[in-house]
């Protein structure tokens, strides 16, 4: 809190690269494919006039950064998994979403009052997406949903996205 103002980061990001997330949480049958987003890992530490800084490797490092900036609460979104809409295989997409959501829930356990994770769901199977959202919120404690705004070859207003529950 700064000057009596509660500060919220409404667009925080966790670096969900393979060594932090998918090697541990993805089922064995998919681990050989963990470089699943082409070009998703980029060198973000270099800027034209110097270094940009370092991404936090742990929740504790993130909390230290938040403290330094005076941020009281952060809603956390994926980084690599922002590209979940590019995955075309329903089962693989569902496995990636479950792995990411498990990772995010564990990350937020370090300070559940300050770190609020946002889930991703496998939109290729709307019924599975509804199940995963329910699991992410009711069992894992995640607080929202990030849905891709671009689905290759589809319109996000199409009826195929309606779950059959």
What spans do the regions from the language model cover?
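Helix-coil boundary/capping segments in enzymes
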Residues: 1-165
């Amino acid at each position: 809190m700064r000057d009596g103002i509660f500060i919220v980061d409404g667009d925080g990001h966790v670096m969900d690269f393979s060594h932090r997330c998918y090697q541990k949480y993805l089922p064995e049958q998919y681990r050989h494919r963990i470089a699943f987003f082409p070009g998703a890992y980029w060198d973000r530490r270099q800027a034209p006039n110097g270094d940009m800084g370092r991404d936090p490797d742990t929740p504790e490092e993130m909390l230290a950064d938040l403290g330094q900036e005076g941020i009281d609460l952060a809603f956390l979104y994926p980084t690599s998994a922002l590209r979940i809409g590019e995955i075309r295989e329903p089962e693989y997409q569902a496995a990636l979403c479950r792995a990411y959501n498990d990772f995010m829930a564990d990350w937020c356990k370090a300070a559940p009052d300050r770190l609020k994770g946002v889930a991703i769901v496998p939109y290729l199977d709307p019924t599975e997406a509804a199940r995963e959202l329910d699991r992410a919120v009711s069992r894992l404690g995640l607080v929202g949903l990030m849905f891709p705004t671009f689905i290759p070859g589809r319109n996000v207003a199409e009826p195929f996205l309606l779950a059959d529950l």
